[in-house]
């Protein structure tokens, strides 16, 4: 059985608030792709506290909470996807609070998740790198707006994680 709990525009804070739903279902596997909206969310009242470290720590907290409350669930954290600021003009700058380019924030989040994976109960699926073009941006082949995947992007994603899905359900 597959249950999609993805919510458009969701943040790590939203997922943390809804973990009881996951505990209820006790899934065999869980594929987590979250974090980009945290760094996009400039309207958050806690914007100053949202950093790559805090986003990565929230993602890890989600995985660890699921393991603690549903120990048979295999948690797979998918790395945050790159963006293409040439296509999505609003992404060309940085957030004024953190003078770190968005692409670098994404890389920092992914780096922290990867480094801490051996100490925690999750597998990392590195999606970020398979979507990069030669300029280290989200390839135009996989997006029409620089942020969201298009049909080709979803096909690449599903093909890449299919082995993890097979492993999780066996």
Question: Over which residues does each language-model region extend?
Answer:
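A short beta-strand-loop structural module common to alpha/beta enzyme folds
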Residues: 1-11
């Amino acid at each position: 059985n597959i249950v999609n709990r993805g919510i458009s525009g969701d943040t790590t804070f939203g997922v943390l608030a809804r973990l009881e739903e996951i505990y209820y279902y006790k899934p065999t596997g869980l594929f987590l792709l979250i974090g980009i909206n945290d760094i996009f969310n400039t309207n958050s009242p806690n914007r100053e506290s949202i950093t790559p470290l805090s986003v990565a720590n929230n993602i890890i907290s989600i995985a660890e909470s699921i393991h603690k409350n549903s120990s048979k669930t295999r948690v797979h954290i998918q790395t945050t996807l790159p963006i293409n600021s040439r296509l999505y003009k609003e992404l060309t700058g940085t957030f004024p609070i953190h003078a770190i380019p968005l692409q670098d924030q994404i890389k920092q989040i992914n780096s922290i998740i990867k480094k801490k994976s051996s100490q925690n109960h999750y597998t990392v699926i590195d999606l970020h790198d398979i979507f990069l073009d030669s300029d280290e941006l989200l390839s135009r082949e996989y997006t029409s707006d620089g942020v969201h995947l298009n049909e080709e992007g979803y096909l690449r994603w599903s093909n890449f994680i299919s082995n993890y899905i097979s492993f999780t359900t066996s």
